Amino acid sequence: MPLSADDPVATALRDAATAALAQASAALSSPAAPVVLLDGRSGAGKTTLAALIAADWPGPVRVVALDDIYPGWDGLAQGAETAREEILAPHRAGRTARWRRWDWSAQRHGESDAVGPGTGLIVEGSGVLTPASAALADVRIWLESPAGSRRERALRRDGDTYRPHWERWAAQEDTHLALDHPRHWATLVAEVP
């Protein structure tokens, strides 16, 4: 998403990035590299915020998008659990995290990926902030944004690929909100117009 100085969405995301970096800097003195979780419904601005945080991160950092992990359009919960088990838990334990990316074209698992324990980690995606994952992160962000704005941004970004799946995905997000209460676990809540 292009960011302009007079755009209220850009301003909200820049402010959230500044606050997230301040929280992450407090964790830099711990033995494990800091972990940031970014959750919010589709189109809230998670990917853009992750890029803003990574751009000013003080050291090596890796952004992992759950879009590369979800096993298809019905895989929100499974993608979040995969991130917790295969990325967050090993990283927090000081081990290299290893996982397989999802190949959306072939509809199956694809290439392997990894991140070392000394690298800061930003994991962004709907469903990532749960009670179990919250314990594995230093900074936990929930992005709140009106449904109409989110839908417009998401469909502008992904167009006809996403349009037939919007309601299906939103239902999985509803389940996540009801079961996991991600806003409750957030150390930072950002309101994005």
Q: Where do the language-model regions lie?
A:
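Conserved lysine of the Walker
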Residues: 46
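NTP-dependent small-molecule kinase module
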Residues: 1-30, 135, 139, 152, ...
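ATP-dependent NMP and nucleoside kinases share a basic, alpha-helical "lid"
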Residues: 111-115, 120-156
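Conserved nucleotide-sensing/catalytic segment adjacent to the nucleotide-binding pocket
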Residues: 62-64, 69-123
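Small-molecule kinase domains that catalyze NTP-dependent phosphoryl transfer to phosphate-bearing small molecules
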Residues: 108, 113, 130, 159-193
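P-loop (Walker A) phosphate-binding loop of NTP-binding proteins
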Residues: 41
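Post-Walker A helix-loop "phosphate-sensing" segment adjacent to the P-loop in P-loop NTPases
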Residues: 54-63
